[in-house]
Amino acid sequence: MNTTETSRAAAPLVLILGLGETGVAAARWYARQGSPLRVTDSRAQPGGLAALQAALADATVEYRLGCGEQFPPDLLDGVAQIVLSPGLVPHESPTRELLEQARERNVEVVGEIELFARALAGLAESREYRPRVLAITGTNGKTTVTALTRQLIEAGGMSARAAGNISPAALAALMDALDQDDLPQVWVLELSSFQLETTRTLAPDAAVVLNVTQDHLDWHGDMQAYAQAKARILKPARLAIVNRDDPLAVAMVESLQALNVRSFGRDVPALVGDMGLELGQGVAWLTACESNDFDEPAPAPRRKKDAPPPTRAGGRMSRLMPVDALRIRGVHNALNALAAMQLARSLDLGWGPMLRTLRDYAGEPHRAELVRSIGDVDYINDSKGTNVGATVAALEGLGQQVVLIAGGQGKGQDFSPLVPVVRRHARAVVLIGVDGAAIGKVLEPTGVPCAAAADMREAVRRAAELAQPGDAVLLSPACASFDMFRNYPHRGEVFAAEVRELALDRGEVA
């Protein structure tokens, strides 16, 4: 037996539970380490299987595919560790029973982000590679903040890679960087609540919780568990950043030392390091609270045992740029910009390059994305608005009357937070999907007209009839898409195609 075979035989058996993007990345990572693998999925032909089999041709892999609704009784035999896919709900069968067996057998359960954290720890020892790590979580805005933060960092002269929930998987990005001998100075990680549930040792240099509203309660069970999952990233972070407009986010940092906390919000910032918005002479500004001392402040003296904890001082407000100079639309995106700048500033980057990049940033697809204007009506694709909080933010942020297209799979959400914002900002609502009628029922007290549509074509045409010059037709469904579409990008693409078709029918091109 050669050396490689010996090391593989001695390595503990790892079970990859679920062959989504993170499961594939974890399998590839462990194969690089010479670990024997057992791979299972409820599907007989999960996506990417052929590519994975080709990549792991020389690895020791046992495939258990097509398990359906019940895992084989011997699935855990010989297993030392389980890598759990974030797509599997831990309190639902058959995953619940398997995880209970794992606990009884003292089998460790981890996620791909935990493996990434351990990989960085290993690289620190073997190659003295110690990158900065920034982490972003929250119900809405994660992808925008992650992508923008990476661009701000690169504008400031540091190399950065974005990974995690934004795709690619963190381990896939790390393997690519290793293979190209191009390890970045900074990792910018978008982390979902699912991923944080199985992450224990990641200690970011800075982490932000953007907001916490109802979502994924089918996965977490209740709002408290969902918020706790988000909060996991703040305590180990050297710098914790929260949205001070969000009571649940603010509560997460109450026990943390004030000097290690920063915030952003819709109001004027009062404490050094905080950021916010200011309305002056009819112009809204992105602002920062900076120290009154132009020299670098002296380090804080060692605190005596019974002394009160240190607090952050007030400072002077600096106007950075007008909100109207941003290409991304809405107050919620102005807040996303503040969060991204705070993360980048944690790396001691200057304002100038960041502000130039921020001015040119056009946003991410399907997130308050202007498709085009037809007859002085804006058509906006916010298909990524898959929960009530996202739709509330979009309605509040646009600053114009809206004909809202909403509906789909509601995921057991409470739709009542839509009532006050629809009453204030919506001229009409067009409802689609299996839970469209449920949304309409909740919105009855608003008095806002609601119309049902059988498909996206009818929804766009009906919304166009209801809109008036100066309005926006906003696709922000507050629901998942799987009842009518492959996913939320497909939903957004169909919306955009129908808008373009409407423009052609009305004789408007480009």
Swiss-Prot record:
Region (Disordered): 294-316
Cellular component per GO, a single term: cytoplasm
A Pfam entry, by short name: MurD-like_N
Keyword Ribosomal protein included in the entry's annotation: no
Transmembrane segments: none
EC number(s) per entry: 6.3.2.9
Pathway stated in the Swiss-Prot or TrEMBL entry: Cell wall biogenesis; peptidoglycan biosynthesis
A molecular function (GO) term: UDP-N-acetylmuramoylalanine-D-glutamate ligase activity
Keyword Lipid biosynthesis tagged: no
Keywords annotated in UniProt: ATP-binding, Cell cycle, Cell division, Cell shape, Cell wall biogenesis/degradation, Cytoplasm, Ligase, Nucleotide-binding, Peptidoglycan synthesis
Compartments, as annotated in UniProt: Cytoplasm
Reaction(s) this enzyme catalyzes, per UniProt: UDP-N-acetyl-alpha-D-muramoyl-L-alanine + D-glutamate + ATP = UDP-N-acetyl-alpha-D-muramoyl-L-alanyl-D-glutamate + ADP + phosphate + H(+)
Record: residues binding ATP: 138-144
GO terms classed as biological process: cell division; cell wall organization; peptidoglycan biosynthetic process; regulation of cell shape
Stored PANTHER family: UDP-N-ACETYLMURAMOYLALANINE--D-GLUTAMATE LIGASE
Function: Cell wall formation. Catalyzes the addition of glutamate to the nucleotide precursor UDP-N-acetylmuramoyl-L-alanine (UMA).
Family: Belongs to the MurCDEF family.
Protein name as it appears in the record: UDP-N-acetylmuramoylalanine--D-glutamate ligase
Naturally occurring in which organism (per UniProt): Bordetella pertussis (strain Tohama I / ATCC BAA-589 / NCTC 13251)
Gene: murD
